[in-house]
């Protein structure tokens, strides 16, 4: 590792100290990411722009260390054209962790706020989102927080999904309070358990509707109102969905909702064509078991201009979630994090065992 790569500089960005290697210059604030501060920067090694996410004090508590470890593992594992790529990672002498990723010019939230999207852009953006999900879902990874602001887009209309830090194993006891409300699948609110990759399809369906219509399809004011606005379009939850509700309180709430009939999607989206409406209805099915999969959605006639089964890979192996049930002390997560970072930089962990943390964390590769 060169001296240049292993030396750090402190830079103040709008009152926040970024302690980065000298490889990164021209830091400019972008905003808050999931659990971290975001900056744009110039990578002196490549000459190109990058995004720097600072996760503050990940070793201050086991829950923070575990969450950061999960994000690191996922970024390393999920290598796909439509998922944001990890370019570099290091732990600063101040023990903050920095993720360096590709920098894309804008996100879908900003695009939708500025102007209506033309049909070919709606089609191409939807295709790329589903292409990413076809890759991650067989790996046992669910994003769980898909929304326009974490759909990144560059000037060539290349799309990449970011913020997989909240993603978790498809297990029967998935924790309940995740996705931004407008894009949250009804089964999350109804059961808080036993949900899977279908929640991502619902979220992308909501984004699809928003791209068509120019406004959120289900703008709930709170948890209760969210379910109400869903039933105003889709009608009352069907019996097969109600029967999955395990909470008595939730069951009583659903039973007390006014009985509603489904509204025609063609009436709700008068500017959409028949293929758009058909796919949208398949994505926004109340019953997650009947909701279309990413692979089947890619094969839908609406996406025929882009669909190519030979160029829509799935993950080769399932993501190893064995760490996720571990209840470890912070120091153990720290050791595991250093090991993952060394592995990312292709450093032989055994040969580096005598190195001190300050010399093993710099971003050199």
UniProtKB/Swiss-Prot annotation:
Phosphorylated. Dually phosphorylated on Thr-175 and Tyr-177, which activates the enzyme. Rapidly dephosphorylated upon either hypo- or hyperosmotic shock. Residues 24-303 form the Protein kinase domain. The modification Phosphotyrosine is found at residue 177. The active site is at residue 145. Induction: By hyperosmotic and hypo-osmotic stress. Less induced than isoform HOG1B under the same conditions. ATP binds at residues 30-38, 53. It is found in: Cytoplasm; Nucleus. Keywords: Activator, ATP-binding, Cytoplasm, Kinase, Nucleotide-binding, Nucleus, Phosphoprotein, Serine/threonine-protein kinase, Transcription, Transcription regulation, Transferase. One of its GO terms (molecular function) is ATP binding. The modification Phosphothreonine is found at residue 175. It catalyses: L-seryl-[protein] + ATP = O-phospho-L-seryl-[protein] + ADP + H(+); L-threonyl-[protein] + ATP = O-phospho-L-threonyl-[protein] + ADP + H(+). GO terms for cellular component: cytoplasm; nucleus. The keyword ATP-binding applies. Coiled coil: none annotated. It is an enzyme of class 2 (transferase). InterPro entries: Kinase-like_dom_sf, MAP_kinase, MAP_kinase_CS, MAPK_p38-like, Prot_kinase_dom, Protein_kinase_ATP_BS, Ser/Thr_kinase_AS. It comes from the Eukaryota. Its cofactor is Mg(2+). Its EC number is 2.7.11.24. A motif (TXY) lies at residues 175-177. Activated by tyrosine and threonine phosphorylation. Its main location: cytoplasm. The TXY motif contains the threonine and tyrosine residues whose phosphorylation activates the MAP kinases. Proline-directed serine/threonine-protein kinase involved in a signal transduction pathway that is activated by changes in the osmolarity of the extracellular environment. Controls osmotic regulation of transcription of target genes. Belongs to the protein kinase superfamily. Ser/Thr protein kinase family. MAP kinase subfamily. HOG1 sub-subfamily. This is Mitogen-activated protein kinase HOG1A. It comes from Wallemia ichthyophaga (strain EXF-994 / CBS 113033).
């Amino acid at each position: 590792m060169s001296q240049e790569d292993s030396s750090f500089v402190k830079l103040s960005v709008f009152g926040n100290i970024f302690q980065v290697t000298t490889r990164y210059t021209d830091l400019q604030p972008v905003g808050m990411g999931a659990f971290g501060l975001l900056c744009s920067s110039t990578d002196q090694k490549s000459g190109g722009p990058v995004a720097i996410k600072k996760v503050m004090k990940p070793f201050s508590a086991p829950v923070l260390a575990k969450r950061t470890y999960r994000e690191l593992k996922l970024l390393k594992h999920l290598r796909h054209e439509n998922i944001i790529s990890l370019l570099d990672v290091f732990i600063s002498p101040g023990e903050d962790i920095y993720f360096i990723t590709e920098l894309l010019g804008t996100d879908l939230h900003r695009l939708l706020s500025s102007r209506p999207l033309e049909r070919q852009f709606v089609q191409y953006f939807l295709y790329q989102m589903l292409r990413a999900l076809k890759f991650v879902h067989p790996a046992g990874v669910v994003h769980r927080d898909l929304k326009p602001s974490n759909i990144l887009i560059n000037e060539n209309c290349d799309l990449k999904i970011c913020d997989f830090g909240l993603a978790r194993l498809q297990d029967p006891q998935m924790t309940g309070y995740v996705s931004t409300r407008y894009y949250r699948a009804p089964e999350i609110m109804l059961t808080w358990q036993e949900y899977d990759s279908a929640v991502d399809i619902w979220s992308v369906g909501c984004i699809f509707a928003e791209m068509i219509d120019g406004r959120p399809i289900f703008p709930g004011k709170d948890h209760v109102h969210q379910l109400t606005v869903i039933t105003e379009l889709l009608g009352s939850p069907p019996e097969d969905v109600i029967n999955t509700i395990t909470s008595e309180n939730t069951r009583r709430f659903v039973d007390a909702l006014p009985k509603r009939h489904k509204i025609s999607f063609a009436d709700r989206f008068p500017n959409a064509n028949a293929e758009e409406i058909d796919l949208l209805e398949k994505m926004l099915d109340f019953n997650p078991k009947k909701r279309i999969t990413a692979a089947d959605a890619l094969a839908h006639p609406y996406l025929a201009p882009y669909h190519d089964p030979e160029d829509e890979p799935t993950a080769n192996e399932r993501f190893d979630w064995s760490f996720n049930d571990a209840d470890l002390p912070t120091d153990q997560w720290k050791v595991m994090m250093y090991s993952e970072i060394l592995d990312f930089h292709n450093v032989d962990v055994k040969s580096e065992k005598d190195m001190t943390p300050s010399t093993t964390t710099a971003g050199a590769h």
